[in-house]
C-alpha cells in the first residue's frame, strides 16, 4: 500500500485505524459473551479477546503493509528470542487485560510503526470508550469518536490533540491501577503536590496528549508493545516519553528482549528538563 518512507500518509493511518476498529469490535463481542481468562507462562492473564484481536490485526497488517515485520504480544509469548527488522510494527492486541477481565473500560488496542528505534505513527483504540487516538510525527495527533467496528471515514467527531505545559499547582499524575510500585511512588515525591489519576492501559498517554494530565511515571519493567503506540500519540501531540535519565525510549531492543526497564511520559520538554533529574 505504501513505501517505507510514507508511513504517515493519511490513507495508511486510516487503514490502520480501520484494523484497530475491527479488532475492537471482536474484543467487545467477547466481552458481551463473557471472557474467560487463563494464565500465560509469565503469569499474566490472556483471554480469547486478546487472541481474536491479534488475528484480525495481523491479517490486516499483512494486507496493507506486506513484507513489514510485526512483533505482537501473544505471538511473542511463544518465543524467547526476537529478530527485529527496521522498520517494524509493534502490536498489543489488548492492553489492559486485567481491566478488561474486571469489567473496567480502560483497555486498548495498540499498533505502532517503529523506524530507527522510534515510533513514527501509532494507533490507540479504546473499544469500550468508543474512542481512537492516533498520531504520526509528520502530521500530529488527533482523537476520533469511533465506536468499535466503524470505519475511520465515518468518524463523527475529530479533535486535534496538543499537550499543555504544567500550569502550576498540583501535578496531574497518571498512575497505573494494576502496576503501581514503590519506586514509582518514591519518584512522585519530587513534586510538592500531585493529583493522582488512576488508570489502566495506554489511555494514560492519551490523557496527557489531550492536555488532561501532566506526567505518567512507570519505574517498573514493561514491554515495548505496551507503550509504543501511546508514545507515538503523545510525542506527535507535543509530549515526550523518556527514560528516567532523560533520553528518548528506544524500541527494537532485542538485547533486552523488547523490555523497557522504566520510563516517564511528560507533557512537554521544559517540564521534563526541569524535573527529570531532581
Model-derived features: positions:
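Oxyanion/phosphate-interacting regions
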Residues: 1-18, 186-190, 204-278
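N-terminal subdomain of lithium-sensitive/metallo-dependent phosphomonoesterases centered on the IMPase/IPPase/PAP
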Residues: 1-94, 182, 186-189, 247, ...
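Residue-level signal for inorganic ion chemistry
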Residues: 27, 50, 61, 97, ...
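Generic detector of well-ordered alpha-helical packing
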Residues: 51, 55, 74, 93-96, ...
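Conserved acidic residues
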Residues: 68, 86-88, 120, 194, ...
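Glycine-rich active-site/cofactor-binding loop and its immediate structural neighborhood
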Residues: 85-124
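Acidic beta-strand-loop-alpha-helix segment within the catalytic core
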Residues: 111-206, 254-278
